[in-house]
A protein has these predicted regions:
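Conserved catalytic-core segment of NTP-binding enzymes
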Residues: 20-93, 219
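Beta-strand->loop->alpha-helix junctions that form or flank phosphate-binding loops
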Residues: 72-75, 87-109, 125-129, 158-164, ...
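Flexible, gly/pro- and Lys/Arg-enriched active-site loops
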Residues: 22, 41-50, 229, 234-252, ...
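Nucleotide phosphate-binding/pyrophosphate-handling subdomain across enzymes
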Residues: 7-18, 24-37, 41-44, 55, ...
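Active-site-proximal loop/hinge segments that shape catalytic or ion-binding/gating pockets
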Residues: 289
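C-terminal helical cap/extension that packs against the catalytic core
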Residues: 74-96, 109-111, 179-180, 188, ...
């Protein structure tokens, strides 16, 4: 259906995100790709992709084809690089990796990103410290499309694109004062990125968390990173057959901080907002699962209107 829609809209360029790995992903039916972007390889979907970073990377690198320019994540784990280099060599193509020495995350307001990358000074539409690396990749992708394939993408267009980028449920700020933030992080890497973003914003345990996870995710490691950010956590059961119950998550969360199981997502958000208000805290963060994010987002948008 997506390809049909793209065809009907007569798109000049299409950005496809793989859903599961790359080699056997549905998006890999496209015979020729201009650019293959490999973001950070982490531990997720291990029951399908493998239990080591090199196995997972080998699946991800399956999107690399002959004639494709490869843009790689600046801080790619060393263990993941072997399969990526092998796939690029077999496809007779080169790898572009943004130079970390050329990338600076500039200080700005809370939960706002500004970067300087190779002379491109830009405000980013996406919060999250990790988005600086993604922005550098986006710049390299645009430059590759210009250099290798003749697409006329101006510097102003690149800067505007970085500023306009939005992704629902990806460290999404729905209200600033008091804070309502939604993030679909569902693995340890995502939890670390959210925690790093909240820490950099100097909230210092001045937040209330609403947390729901799936039972097959590494939620114990996620809790280790996220719990220090919260004065209290309300646990919920996401709307998914694979969900960990709010009660089971609460048992684990209470080893880290004050935790209470809520009857529903709506109940948790209501209690979290009230707790933050009564204790003069900065706000509420809902995170742990995209299933939770889908249910929570309409409720948070309604709350943000008050």
């Amino acid at each position: 259906l997506a390809f049909l829609w793209f065809a009907r809209e007569k798109c000049d360029l299409v950005v496809l995100e793989t859903g599961l790995g790359g080699r056997c992903d549905a998006t890999n039916v496209v015979p020729h790709k201009l650019v293959a972007a490999i973001t950070k390889i982490g531990y997720d979907h291990m029951e399908v992709l493998g239990d080591t970073l090199d196995k997972i990377a080998a699946e991800k690198a399956g999107i690399i084809k002959e004639g494709t320019v490869v843009v790689n994540y600046p801080d790619q784990p060393a263990e993941a690089m072997g399969p990526i280099l092998t796939a690029a060599a077999e496809a007779h193509t080169s790898i572009i990796t943004p130079d970390k020495d050329d990338l600076t995350l500039l200080r700005g307001k809370r939960l706002e990103n500004r970067i300087d990358y190779g002379g491109y000074r830009a405000a980013l539409g996406l919060p999250g410290t990790h988005q600086a690396n993604h922005a550098a990749m986006a710049v390299e992708i645009a430059l590759a499309l210009w250099r290798e394939f003749g697409y006329d993408i101006s510097d102003d267009a690149i800067l505007q694109g970085l500023a306009d980028a939005r992704m629902p449920a990806r460290i999404e700020v729905l209200r600033r004062h008091p804070l309502l933030l939604l993030d679909g992080c569902h693995n340890p890497d995502g939890a670390k990125m959210l925690a790093a973003t909240l820490t950099r914003a100097d909230f210092e345990e001045n937040l209330v968390g609403v947390l729901g996870v799936l039972a097959d995710k590494d939620y114990k490691d996620m809790l280790s990173d996220l719990a220090p950010c919260f004065a209290k956590i309300y646990t919920v059961t996401p709307n998914c057959p694979r969900a960990l119950s709010a009660e089971e998550l609460q048992k684990e969360a209470r080893f880290h901080t004050d935790a209470e199981a809520a009857d529903s997502v709506a109940d948790a958000i209501r209690k979290a907002v009230d707790y933050a208000d009564e204790n003069n805290l900065a706000g509420v963060v809902v995170c742990g699962s995209l299933y939770l994010a889908a249910e929570a987002r309409p409720l948070l948008l309604k709350e943000a209107e008050k």
